[in-house]
Amino acid sequence: MALEGVLKEGFVTTTADQLINWTRNGSLWPMTFGLACCAVEMMHAGASRYDLDRFGVVFRPSPRQSDLMIVAGTLCNKMAPALRKVYDQMPEPRWVISMGSCANGGGYYHNSYSVVRGCDRIVPVDIYVPGCPPTAEALIYGIIQLQSKIARTSTIARKA
């Protein structure tokens, strides 16, 4: 009713970019890539106390159904090709959240010969969530930041 009072003509005007981004913003489907203890906090964020479903986040079991990858934990050299392969299987548009110090830059194992010093060397990362391990609140804040980033992006190519 409040909307009808504001819109006297009975219609809403918007751009296609805003409409598309609004739908993408409210329906992120992450594919979890849990590698270490950060994955426990990611599961905690999806449980009943924090309930990521209220933000439109629904965890999917397949990369072909996902548009968001959450890399949580230490990425080893042997796991890096698998990470890239799963990322390549995701449809466009796709986003990546790097969760935890180990995924961000190697963390405690930074000087180890077998650790990739940041998953951004393998896949492009949109949001970094710091912490060891980051709390569920930090992951939720990262998801909210990603939603605002999606709302600002242009989805339709404009010709000059």
Curated annotation (Swiss-Prot):
Protein name: NADH-quinone oxidoreductase subunit B
Pfam families for the chain: Oxidored_q6 (PF01058)
Gene field: nuoB
Annotated catalysed reactions: a quinone + NADH + 5 H(+)(in) = a quinol + NAD(+) + 4 H(+)(out)
Organism annotation: Polynucleobacter asymbioticus (strain DSM 18221 / CIP 109841 / QLW-P1DMWA-1) (Polynucleobacter necessarius subsp. asymbioticus)
Entry's localization field: Cell membrane
Cysteine pairs bridged by disulfides in the record: none
Cofactor section: [4Fe-4S] cluster
Residues binding [4Fe-4S] cluster, per UniProt: 37-38, 102, 132
Enzyme class: translocase
